[in-house]
Design a protein with these regions (language model features):
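H-loop/switch region of ABC-family ATPase nucleotide-binding domains
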Residues: 234-235
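Helical segment within the ABC ATPase nucleotide-binding domain
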Residues: 213-226
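Pre-NBD coupling/linker segments of ABC/ABC-like ATPases
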Residues: 2-72, 261-283
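Conserved ABC ATPase "signature" region
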Residues: 54-61, 141, 153-170
Length: 286
């Protein structure tokens, strides 16, 4: 009987997802679903102004093409259980978005290992996966395909996506004419059409009206109750406290603190509220 049930679930997954990487995880609630060990991300920062291919190749051949190494994340260790809600705090450039891109399989670490199980719906950048030249209707199918959904599944969820996004009157309008809030509605509605094992939201809900933000927060809460794992980045500390039970504070690619959301948020807020150190004034020349 158990084998029959497993076979049925596998068939259901095949109707929804076109990629094996997007099939539902077998990880039980409370077990590790995301594991990062000693993850380091390096970027090459080019300070030279090279504006054509000829100059680029000349510098490359003559070994005059110099890069400065930039460490975006350094030796990050993270163990996230299925069903947990994690908030990531830090100032701009701390490495929060980079960390989420690692989990989303967008970036490959220079060193360390990353293990992610199950389906991932990533809302990392406003407009990512959305073609501004296409209509909202066409983008629902395009974005859904990029997330690994089958055409049959997108068609079955089409009305639900449109209803949640509240874009009924703009379905056949080019997305390039949409406001930032309308793009957010569209992207969030598509990403949450099926409850993923892991939902990643990176400051995408910073735009949009208050009513839709509350609607999205309620949707995320419902998904958490059903076992979805949440990775959430926001500069709104109150929102992180409300939505998450765990938090990580990053600063220039390094981990400052990891723990329960209230403790980490309070420590981060205290640091941000502290007066800036006074600038040392140079002594007057005699």
């Amino acid at each position: 009987m158990a084998n029959v049930e497993e076979k049925k679930n596998e068939l259901d997954d095949k109707k929804i997802f076109t990629s094996n990487a997007q099939r539902t995880t077998t990880v039980a609630k409370g077990e590790t679903i995301i594991e990062l060990k000693d993850v380091t991300i390096r970027f090459n920062k080019n300070n030279l102004k090279v504006d054509n291919l000829k100059e680029y190749f000349i510098r490359l051949v003559t070994k005059q093409l110099m890069f400065q190494e930039f460490i975006a994340l350094k030796d990050i260790n993270l163990d996230i259980k299925k069903g947990e809600a994690w908030g990531f705090l830090g100032t701009n450039g701390a490495g929060k978005s980079t960390l989420l891109k690692v989990v989303s399989r967008i970036l490959k670490p220079a060193s360390g290992t990353v293990k992610v199980s199950g389906t991932v719906a990533a809302l990392i950048e406003l407009g990512a996966g959305i073609d501004p030249q296409l209509t909202a209707r066409e983008n629902i199918f395009l974005n859904g395909t990029l997330l690994g959904y089958s055409k049959a599944f997108i068609e079955s969820k089409f009305d639900d996506i449109v209803e949640f996004s509240e874009l009924q009157d703009f379905l056949d309008s080019p997305v390039k004419n949409f406001s930032s809030g309308m793009k957010t509605r569209l992207a969030f509605s598509i990403a949450t059409a099926v409850e993923p094992d892991i939902l990643i939201a990176d400051e995408i809900l910073a735009v949009g009206d208050m009513r839709f933000k509350k609607k999205c927060a309620a949707k995320m809460t419902a998904m958490l109750e059903d076992g979805t794992t949440l990775l959430y980045v926001s500069h709104n500390i109150a929102a992180v406290k409300k939505q998450c039970n765990k938090a990580m504070w990053l600063d220039h690619g390094n981990v400052v603190m990891v723990g329960d959301a209230d403790t980490v948020c309070d420590a981060f807020k205290a640091e941000m509220d502290a007066p800036a150190p006074a600038k040392t004034q140079s002594k007057d020349k005699k």
